[in-house]
Amino acid sequence: MRRSSVMSVVAVVAATGLLLGGCTSDKKNANSGPAATVEIKPTGDYNPLERDQIKDGGELTLPILEVPEQSNSLHGNAIVDGTTLWRWYNPQMTLADGDGTWHPNPAYLTNVNAEEVDGKTVVTYDINPDAVFNDGTPIDWRVFETMWKFNNAENPDVVANSTDGYDQIESVTTGESDKQAVVTYKQAYPWWQALFDRVLHPSVADAQTFNEGYLKNPHPEWGAGPYKVDQFDYNSGTVSFVPNEKWWGEKPKLDKVTYRQMESQATINAYQAGEVDAVEITNKDHLAVAKTVKDTTLRGTLRPSNYLVTLNAKTPTLEDVKVREAVFTGINRETLAQVRFNGMDYTENLPGSFALFQNQKGYQDNFGGLVTYDQDKAKQLLDEAGWTEGSDGIREKDGKKLTLRYVTFGDSQLTKSTAAAMQKMLKDIGVDLQVAERPSSDFSKVIAEREFDVLTSGFTSYDPYGVAYFKQVYASDSELNKSGTGTPEMDKKIAELQQLPTQEEQIKRANELEKEALQQYGIMPYVNGPQLYATKNGLANYGSYAFALVPKENIGWAK
């Protein structure tokens, strides 16, 4: 399970054992009485209920910020919203508890066995005999082979989201039958549970199909699971799913699931009007509105994500590492955090790593030791880079002003306040930060085409195996990190990191390498934060998930 990009209008991730002030903790009615806090539960808060406690029938309507044109969740331009939609109609091979504990999904995998043979990790997957794609193609060992071939970095024409782990596989073969896949790694590989949460239909047979086959085409016939595509309108931003008559597992509880694309501010208005059944609370204004809505449950959790500032080193102005260091040195991360959490009675330590989160074993603050807010130092760095202060205070070099384009998405007040804070801080060191406002639906396009100098966005993790994705974050060909600051030297060191046989050894080395990689000054973490959802009372197995992956057929309304 890899990481995906998410636009920065969403505040996510809370540290263990926190309480968030200013919102109700009542689980029946948001108007039933004034309560001071809602608990931030580190292992998820999504009303887990057994199937016999959930009604048969009903509909679920949810907001989404973008229905991206790229529907392949494994593609390098995939974003969180695309992955959210993908999971409703494609094989969900594995499940997880909120703390990240991994389980095979019995609807697809009847048994999984991992062992070490001659120094190599060998994982055997027994596939459910009934598992089949919507077009009748069996889900067998070939889907594992297809997944491996398109994510192992061997074909330079394939634009994969991440090759971490898959590039460590030596072979994928059939076992005792076509319904058994045997995955053999090149050496001992400690993160094997991070792989094959998803699989690809064997019809994805070449790079062009992988890269372009899902553009404005969800390929419902290549899907499988309890739900199938009912409507997928990329223009209107409406996507819906209904029960799949070809599903072999437990009957899905809902009659229909609908996503509607809307801007961040519109999501809370739609929830207040009863037009959607759940909404993410991203700022104090959303929180205030959610508290007024009857029959609402507020849910808070730890959802591992890093929000970050990215500098595009591929642009002429930012290709100089001294300029990038100056920009980061001139940004007060504490100020950005205060803007993010304004009115939410919440504080946290500044994040310092993209490899691990602050509550994970082995975490180190690898960024904080490199960069501290210091305007005088930032100005000195710009002096050294040849940018001198002009009469208006803006730096100049060779007759050109030091102007950077900061692209934002959506219309939320949080986005505007963050932009204003960034402009003020950078103006103080002589940088003219021009804000370019774009609709939320442009996020994936801007990311894919690097149409920015400065960007705030997020890296969202789906599992606790962060070091397993070190290459995805820091390699020179990363499709996640759009700063363009990777180097061949770091690529070589990452390859050596991935050869280490234990998680402990990889974590230790990853911390050392991250300190080096961050000295390219391409990405800067500035907050994690709480994830809050407002949901209608009775919504089961949905909300703030942390690391949880629940069976889609079990989402529904409590009896």
Model regions and ranges:
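Ligand-site clamp/hinge motif
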Residues: 243-289, 432-434, 439-440
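Append "and occasionally in soluble cytosolic enzymes with long acidic Gly/Pro-rich linkers
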Residues: 242, 321-424, 559
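N-terminal lobe/hinge region of extracytoplasmic solute-binding protein
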Residues: 58-116, 222-223
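Detector for C-terminal structural segments
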Residues: 43-44, 331-363, 414-423, 447-559
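Aromatic- and charge-enriched surface segment that lines or borders ligand/interaction sites
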Residues: 110-157, 182, 317-319
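Gly/Pro-rich hinge or "lid" segments in bacterial periplasmic/extracellular proteins
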Residues: 87, 98-99, 197-252, 256, ...
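Surface-exposed binding/hinge segments that line
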Residues: 53-55, 124, 160-209
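Ligand/substrate-recognition segments at binding pockets and active sites
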Residues: 234, 388-461
